[in-house]
UniProtKB/Swiss-Prot annotation:
This is Serine hydroxymethyltransferase. It is found in: Cytoplasm. GO terms for biological process: glycine biosynthetic process from serine; tetrahydrofolate interconversion. The record marks 226 as: Plays an important role in substrate specificity. Its cofactor is pyridoxal 5'-phosphate. The keyword Cytoplasm applies. Its main location: cytoplasm. (6S)-5,6,7,8-tetrahydrofolate binds at residues 118, 122-124, 240, 350-352. It comes from the Bacteria. NCBIfam families: PRK00011.1 (NF000586). SUPFAM superfamilies: PLP-dependent transferases. The modification N6-(pyridoxal phosphate)lysine is found at residue 227.
Length: 414
């Protein structure tokens, strides 16, 4: 397959080869990224990319869908088995579109929604004014406690009582602690609101039984299929059976046309992997590595939002190093460590600058990194940030990164 691409389009082939080289040679710590299996990539690069299949299994608007119907049913059934969901839609192209479909199912323009503040750990689609969610709906924000940096559930309840939202959104893109979904449902019930949980970052941990499952508590659960779930980039929706027809209509014909059947096939393969015993071991290793990395960073004198982590994600406050998140991201990338700048609770800097960096352990754990490697990564991060203007020190860091990544070859068949 690669040989065909190389002969047909040398420029695209070269860019893909360069990206493969980047992934092999750098330490990937972006919390929303992971490395899929070769089987997932094979499914996504299959002949299913040729097939249009508007509609759902058994009710398509095109002929010739008998085989893609099988694939979509496999994907849906596996998700039900993993999470205990009553109904599943695996067609969303992204987590953002999954969230949009839920909003379109139960909200009217201007309805009030309670969601987590973006700088406190929420997501753009949870009411940011630059996103469709903040434009179409009246979002009221809740956040974290100023000292503990954990969700203040009493504050959530108080705001829910005051504003009477039609929907409460739980879930986050930069919150390193366990979320109490049962408490959120109690709050939603008290004010007569629906509850939607966006579990995009923690879905793999939930699948492995290592994080509380939101499905028994939420009317709707949305997620991406990559991140800790280690599937292709995409989204899905899990919901109570009473909302099944509405959700399906919101996706098609509501906001999407034909589903990406090659991606759904890749999702199905990833869900099959998540059902294996070794996936639970993998997820436990993600958490163990995150805890070890957090401990190492703190020993090096770095400040962590909330003081640590319960999941795969760590948020570093770099202000005591007298640098910005933007500078930290750049200098770490220069030595071969990939992270992303990120706002922190009660942020004062621009989102293009930020006071923090977000890191995660899903990708390095997929690659085989263990606890001792987390010690070295913590040392490397601290050494690099503390010496960000010292070229000799940065060159030493580059060599240490190269020595570490060389121990863990990846995608050797490509």
């Amino acid at each position: 397959m690669v040989d065909h691409l190389k002969r047909q389009d040398e420029k695209v082939f070269a860019a893909i080869e360069a990206e493969l080289g980047r992934q092999r040679s750098k330490i990937e710590l972006i919390a929303s990224e992971n490395f899929v299996s070769e089987a997932v990539m094979e499914a996504q690069g299959s002949v299913l990319t040729n097939k249009y299949a508007e509609g759902y299994p058994g009710k398509r608007y095109y002929g010739g869908c008998e085989h893609v119907d099988v694939v979509e049913d496999i994907a849906r059934d596996r998700v039900k088995e993993i999470f205990g969901a009553e109904h599943v839609n695996v067609q969303p192209h992204s987590g953002a579109q999954a969230n949009m479909a839920v909003y379109f199912t139960i909200l009217e323009q201007g309805d009030t929604v309670l969601g987590m503040n973006l700088s406190h750990g929420g997501h753009l689609t949870h009411g940011s004014p630059v996103n469709f969610s903040g434009v179409q709906y009246n979002f009221v924000e809740y956040g974290v406690d100023a000292e503990s940096h954990r969700i203040n559930y009493d504050d959530v309840l108080a705001k829910a009582k005051e504003h009477k939202p039609k929907l409460i959104v739980a879930g986050a893109s930069a919150y390193p602690r366990v979320i109490d979904f049962k408490r959120f449902r109690e709050i939603a019930d008290e004010v007569g609101a629906y509850l939607m949980v966006d579990m995009a970052h923690i879905a793999g941990l939930v699948a492995a039984g290592l994080h509380p499952n939101p499905v028994p508590h939420a009317h709707f659960v949305t997620t991406t299929t990559h991140k800790t779930l280690r599937g292709p980039r995409g989204g899905m929706i899990l919901c109570e059976e009473q909302f099944a027809k509405q959700i399906d209509k919101s996706i098609f014909p509501g906001i999407q046309g034909g589903p990406l059947m090659h991606v759904i096939a890749a999702k199905a393969v990833a869900f099959g992997e998540a059902l294996q015993d070794d996936f639970k071991t993998y997820a436990q290793n993600i958490i163990n590595n995150a805890n070890r990395l957090a401990e190492g960073l703190q020993k090096e004198g770095l400040t962590l939002v909330s003081g640590g982590t319960d999941n795969h994600l760590i948020l570093i406050d770099v202000r005591n190093l007298e640098i910005t998140g933007k500078v930290a991201e750049h200098v770490l990338d220069e030595v071969g460590i990939t992270v992303n700048k990120n706002t922190i609770p009660f942020e004062t800097a621009s989102p293009f600058v930020t006071s923090g960096v977000r890191i995660g352990t899903a990708a390095v754990t997929s690659r085989g990194f263990g606890l001792e490697d987390m010690d070295e990564i913590a040392s490397l991060i601290a050494y690099t940030l503390k010496n960000h203007e010292n070229e000799a020190a940065l060159e030493e860091a580059r060599k240490r990164v190269e020595a570490l990544t060389s121990k863990f070859p990846m995608y050797t068949d490509l």
